[in-house]
Amino acid sequence: MTEKHKTMGKFKVIVLAGTAGTGKSTIAGELIHEFKDIYPDLKFIEGDDLHPPANVEKMTRGIPLNDDDRWDWLKKVAVESTKAAASTKEHLSIVACSSLKKKYRDLIRHTCPESEFHFIFLYASKIEVLKRLKTRKGHFMKADMMESQFRDLELPDINDETDCDIVPLDFKTFYQIEKDVIQVVKSKVLNIE
């Protein structure tokens, strides 16, 4: 365990946030690869896998989730990502979770106060997300549900939510996006350069 983790006495959870189609899971895989030498047991939780069947069914039928659909799911995201962090030597995990509204992020924080959550928002324009969703296969979130995600999206005010960062995606290569996210993780979460 690093000295930083010992003194904080908390688990650390990196939350890759943003609308569908922003590459949260793909970036998570890149983070696992990037940090495998210093965090060999780093765990990734796919937040979509934690949705109850009723939520998946609703989204599969093209019906957007409402707040009531999300509360238990968000609590489960907080609990499972904290368990994943607790199971690693360095007490660190990564979770992909849209975390679209401030009240969702607040619920995650308050559900597991023993964890320090850092939300990294992958933000792309509607045009970019639509392009990505149209080429995506095998996922219940379809392009026609994008509007509801953008309607719900409350990008964090990083002066108010100091545990949040926004990484813009438009007009960047995947390599540049990956590099930007890695830099945020190093400087804001792991405190390494």
Curated annotation (Swiss-Prot):
It is found in: Cytoplasm. ATP binds at G18, T19, A20, G21, T22, G23, K24, S25. GO terms for biological process: D-gluconate metabolic process. GO terms for cellular component: cytoplasm; fungal-type vacuole. It is an enzyme of class 2 (transferase). Pfam families: APS_kinase (PF01583). It catalyses: D-gluconate + ATP = 6-phospho-D-gluconate + ADP + H(+). InterPro entries: P-loop_NTPase, Therm_gnt_kin. GO terms for molecular function: ATP binding; gluconokinase activity. Belongs to the gluconokinase GntK/GntV family. This is Probable gluconokinase.
